[in-house]
A protein has these predicted regions:
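Macromolecular interaction modules
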Residues: 2-254
Length: 254
């Protein structure tokens, strides 16, 4: 996405999925990424940096778990640069820890932010402090056999407001992956970051679907979600992870 910097000019958003050594423990992810990698990235002149980490604070299971035994990424690194063509130094830094790295040039829609809904107050914590609650981060490709514009319209005009109405989201960052930065990357069109008030709002179905203990409402909301999902992606290739959000350098200005 093109963002206007505070002092003029525009920047682009890139997102990198980072796979660490298989067997890396959750309590090792934070020190590695926040203390080892993030300072180097910040020194490289980035305009903004956010890390979503599968760390010791993100222990609850995903609502849509990956197949048993699959090696899933442990970090999603979002960064803002002047020009994606000069991303080489960034990738060199990330490759210090990554056994696999997949980057995408994305267009971001900040559909909702902290303080816009009743589920959270406006952000009041500084850069470098973990965001409260928990994230779910989903990836999916365009559903095979669909027209792109119709698919995109359904995602943006129907799925986004529907899920906003029946789920307790604090923040919803909708990233449209317009192109992979390496041809060997997975085919993705969407990287969706959703923040929730607490882990219990993800693990408790009645809280996750705002049914207030009513099983009929729960069933109706789950059915609505599944019907929308079937028009968006293949459940066999869609992935969802629970992660911690770390805003390390907020992009200023607009």
């Amino acid at each position: 996405m093109l963002w206007r910097k505070q002092k003029g000019g525009v920047v682009e958003k890139l997102q990198y999925w980072v796979w660490l050594d298989e067997g890396t423990k959750r309590e090792e992810v934070g020190p590695l990424m926040l203390e080892g990698i993030a300072p180097q990235l910040l020194e490289s002149g980035l305009h903004g940096l956010i890390m979503d980490l599968d760390d010791e604070f993100a222990t609850i299971p995903s609502p849509v778990p990956a197949p048993e035994g699959e090696h899933t990424p442990q970090a999603l690194v979002s960064l803002w640069v002047d020009c994606y063509d000069r991303r080489g130094p960034v990738e060199e830094i990330l490759n210090q820890c990554a056994v696999r790295l997949e980057g995408y040039q994305v267009i971001e829609s900040l559909y909702s932010d902290y303080g816009m809904a009743k589920w959270s107050a406006p952000r009041n914590w500084p850069d470098g402090q973990r965001s409260p609650g928990i994230l779910t981060v989903a990836t999916f490709d365009q559903l095979e056999g669909t027209d792109f514009e119709s698919w995109l319209r359904f995602w943006h005009d129907h799925q986004s407001p529907m899920s906003e109405a029946i789920q307790p989201r604090c923040r919803y960052v909708r990233n449209w992956a317009v192109r992979p930065l390496n041809p060997s990357n997975r085919a993705l069109k969407a990287i969706v970051e959703e923040a929730w008030p607490s882990p219990e709002h993800v693990t408790d179905p009645h809280k996750f679907f705002l049914s207030d203990g009513d099983n009929d409402v729960l069933s109706a909301n789950v059915t609505t979600m599944l019907e929308h999902a079937e028009k968006l992606f293949d459940m066999n290739t869609m992935r969802s992870l629970t992660m911690s959000e770390w805003m390390l350098k907020t992009l200023r200005g607009s």
